[in-house]
């Protein structure tokens, strides 16, 4: 993160002519298990990762907000808080910030303007929640600058609202919640219905390895919407609000009444919720063989019942699995149809995993994987100014 801090503080001083008073960060995340359960009111188990979005900021006496995006060639934007905050079709990066600030105002928070320089190293388009990190870091920045009486959970909800209503992208609450509330060396078990969270300690000797398949993700939106509709149709058959409320026994008893594809989709969600709760327990106990079993079952369910994996992802999972055996776990993570694989491995195995992927993945798929070796880090907050 030190390079990011250097970038934002130097750029701030150069472009604004004075030093920033606050440095704030919010992390990206990876979901360890619990896929496509969020919109079914289920459980997820993400952790925050040590790839962050960082802001250098200072209060203003007036109501101007001046923005600089280091990662977009120091592109700038500015607006007045007393005027209507409008969507900018030509500056997508700025809309996440505008949306967060607009939603804070609508929630009744009062503050003046700010000078803000932002930069991040969360890989974009890899499904590691660079957008949620940006939304959360902006909410956190105004909290820190103006001592706003806002909880971390509300910062997360405010970010989700900005993405849904202002940016116009439908997302669950997981990404913002883990970015706002993550704890170092812990995963977070999140109940997507009650929004209750529980920090789950991770074994000390564990690396979180994220492997981007670099398979271009096609069909994501249309297939995602289809899966949501199928899950809603299944819930309707059972007369419940969401698949969270259906047991496997109930599904089996009514299977004949369901469309076979809908039944498969429902089976994934119901079993994935169970697996996520069991995985949290295995993590607490440091039971790697059990965690590995659950992650393998999760991947098989996404492949066979939810049908969201692709050949490249399955290949990547098989390569990693062959290296780690029962001493860790690996599965696809994220929406599907490409994207990333997450592996929980002993630090001593990281090099062997990297080597196996380098040797076999490109040969099998024609693609090179990008590998990020991470650890579970803390959620959004102030970075001490050195």
From Swiss-Prot:
Enzyme Commission code: 2.7.1.6
Pathway where it operates: Carbohydrate metabolism; galactose metabolism
Active site (catalytic residues): 175
Residues holding ATP: 125-131
Annotated Gene3D superfamilies: 3.30.230.10, GHMP kinase, C-terminal domain
Key words, A-Z: ATP-binding, Carbohydrate metabolism, Cytoplasm, Galactose metabolism, Kinase, Magnesium, Metal-binding, Nucleotide-binding, Transferase
Positions annotated to bind substrate: 35-38, 224
Binding site for Mg(2+): 131, 163
PROSITE patterns with a match to the protein in the record: GALACTOKINASE (PS00106), GHMP_KINASES_ATP (PS00627)
Domain of life: Bacteria
Site feature Transition state stabilizer, where: 29
Similarity field: Belongs to the GHMP kinase family. GalK subfamily.
Known function: Catalyzes the transfer of the gamma-phosphate of ATP to D-galactose to form alpha-D-galactose-1-phosphate (Gal-1-P).
Protein's UniProt name: Galactokinase
Organism expressing this protein natively: Vibrio cholerae serotype O1 (strain ATCC 39315 / El Tor Inaba N16961)
Phylogenetic classification of the source organism: Bacteria, Pseudomonadati, Pseudomonadota, Gammaproteobacteria, Vibrionales
């Amino acid at each position: 993160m030190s390079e990011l801090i250097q970038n934002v503080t130097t750029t701030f001083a150069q472009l604004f002519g004075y030093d920033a008073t606050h440095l704030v960060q919010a992390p990206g995340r990876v979901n360890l298990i619990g896929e496509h359960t969020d919109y079914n009111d289920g459980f997820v188990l993400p952790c925050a990762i040590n790839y962050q979005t960082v802001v250098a900021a200072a209060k203003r006496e007036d109501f101007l907000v001046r923005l600089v995006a280091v990662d977009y060639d120091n592109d700038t934007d500015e607006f007045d808080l007393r005027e209507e905050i409008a969507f900018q079709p030509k500056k997508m990066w700025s809309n996440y910030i505008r949306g967060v600030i607009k939603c804070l105002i609508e929630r009744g928070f009062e503050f003046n303007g700010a000078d803000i320089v932002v930069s991040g190293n969360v890989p974009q388009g890899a499904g590691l929640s660079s957008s949620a990190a940006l939304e959360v870091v902006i909410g956190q920045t105004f909290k820190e600058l103006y001592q706003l009486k806002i909880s971390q959970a509300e910062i997360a909800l405010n970010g989700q609202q900005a993405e849904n209503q202002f940016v116009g992208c439908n997302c669950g609450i997981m990404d913002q919640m883990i970015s706002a509330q993550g704890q170092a060396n812990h995963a977070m078990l999140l109940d997507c219905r009650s929004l209750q969270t529980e920090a789950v300690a991770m074994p000390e000797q564990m690396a979180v390895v994220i492997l981007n398949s670099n398979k271009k993700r096609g069909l994501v939106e249309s297939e995602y919407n289809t899966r949501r509709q199928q899950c809603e149709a299944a819930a309707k058959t059972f007369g419940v609000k969401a698949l969270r409320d259906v047991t496997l026994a109930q599904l089996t008893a009514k299977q004949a009444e369901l469309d076979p594809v809908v039944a498969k989709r429902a089976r994934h969600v119901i079993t994935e919720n169970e697996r996520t709760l069991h995985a949290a327990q295995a993590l607490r106990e440091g039971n790697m063989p059990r965690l590995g079993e659950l992650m393998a079952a999760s991947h098989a369910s996404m492949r066979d019942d939810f049908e969201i994996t692709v050949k490249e992802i399955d290949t990547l999972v098989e390569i990693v699995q062959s290296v780690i055996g029962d001493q860790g776990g690996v599965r696809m993570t994220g929406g599907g149809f490409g994207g990333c694989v997450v592996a929980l491995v002993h630090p001593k195995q990281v090099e062997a995993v990297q080597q196996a992927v380098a040797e076999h993945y490109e040969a099998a798929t024609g693609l090179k994987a990008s590998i990020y070796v991470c650890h579970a880090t803390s959620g959004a907050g102030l970075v001490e100014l050195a």
